[in-house]
């Protein structure tokens, strides 16, 4: 089986690793960590002949300009990659990549590759695209073997690309060109004259680069929004609604949550969206004209039972005697959590369907029908959708608004209205913040001076919706405040986002990057972000040479420095071997009578 060495080069973040992973695994990688250097292998059949294809991935950052060419000897074909939505990566082919290959590995065939074809035509990206015509013109200008436009995500043209690369590497024209290549010609030139063979035996072999290892995986903590909402319902804290039944215990709830979850209750309480039907009239509610409701009583109420400030009113709703308390409570639980609570198929599910249909809440009816039809595995997706919908509607109706507000936060001298029922149960810190400790402040909580308005608003939005505007805001500030409020899932979301920011900020270079990665490591250590800490430690260790030259490196404590030095990549023994190799090459150049001249 003939072995083919294929080396992939190009700017950082153009999709080189995704291209190789998608080709060798037939799947797009769900997570991507920038490559330092990596190798892949595939056995393929081309034109009825078997080939072992060695795929060499390289780092595009300028920090590795010295080490990258050590992957070039014995290469049979190069792929130079650019992203079709990054004109800078295309322009670097002529400015950087072609000259680098021409210098270190002349006469080796090159195939030009356009990546991320699936993004072509996405006008919302607002990035200048590179046309196929421009790419083909460059192929003709520089004498490349061809151009293929690909999408690793959609598997577009991947097989065509690597088939072309193998045919190019094994073509008679390519073999003839390689024989002219000198010391860095490919392994395919081993059939040249005996004098060439003896000369090539004296050429030093580059040291084998040890693997850098993969970056640690950052896990996102699973949302517990439904469990937190159930805890809020069961605690009955801050409730301003009481549903009463004939000779049965009442059910307590919260108007802000009921309105966020159900159009029926928005019409009952008079807080409708523009897409809703008109609100019910109070007279109709008290005269039995609204199905399932016998009467509604509204009483002024300044304080909750625990002495904290209330939403201003307490509403008592008498439920029609035809409605079973268990069925109605199941309905309320479903509004809060999106989870259908039942014992078995005989647990009054038909009655629950009837109630759901009478109030126009189709999702509860669907969940019950799924159980009766043996399709209960579909219900978690309904719950996830309802949790998201509740959060989004609560944001639209109530976020930072005075309507039904029962607490105010004072941040940087500005007052923010909030609703305790929508932020309760998220963490013990939050619960303590809005509880009895602040009775004397009349429902006002003043945050400390180190809390910024924008970061607090992001935290508050997360409390309402389980989503936070991390991309638009200060991700580090949100992480710090999220840790203070003990919102561990939010911290994990920030950790993942910041890790991606590190990748984006270092696509061109690491030493010259404007992002302070060492500062992020120190922040992660101080603010209980262990996943980000591990990621930063791995990144700094794996890019030790450029990172140690940054002035922030001196800020690291001795323990952290020792860990980084002990895990540095490339390791010291490899760098020493590189120095020895370079010395041997210099000796060979000086004694080879012009063999290294172009």
Curated annotation (Swiss-Prot):
Region forming the signal peptide: none
One Pfam family it belongs to: Ras
SMART domains registered for this protein in UniProt: BTB, RAB, RAN, RAS, RHO
GO cellular component: cell projection; cytoplasmic vesicle; cytoskeleton; plasma membrane
GO terms, molecular function: GTP binding; GTPase activity; protein kinase binding
Protein residues bound to GTP: 11-17, 57-61, 115-118
Residue span of region Disordered: 175-210
Keyword Nucleotide-binding: yes
UniProtKB keywords: GTP-binding, Nucleotide-binding, Repeat
Disulfide bonds: none
Residue ranges of the motif Effector region: 32-40
GO biological process entries: actin filament organization; cortical cytoskeleton organization; establishment or maintenance of cell polarity; mitotic cytokinesis; regulation of actin cytoskeleton organization; regulation of cell shape; response to bacterium; signal transduction
UniProt biased composition (Low complexity): 182-197
Record domain BTB: where: 239-344, 405-472
Subunit structure: Interacts with pakB.
Protein family per UniProt: In the N-terminal section; belongs to the small GTPase superfamily. Rho family.
Protein name (database record): Rho-related protein racA
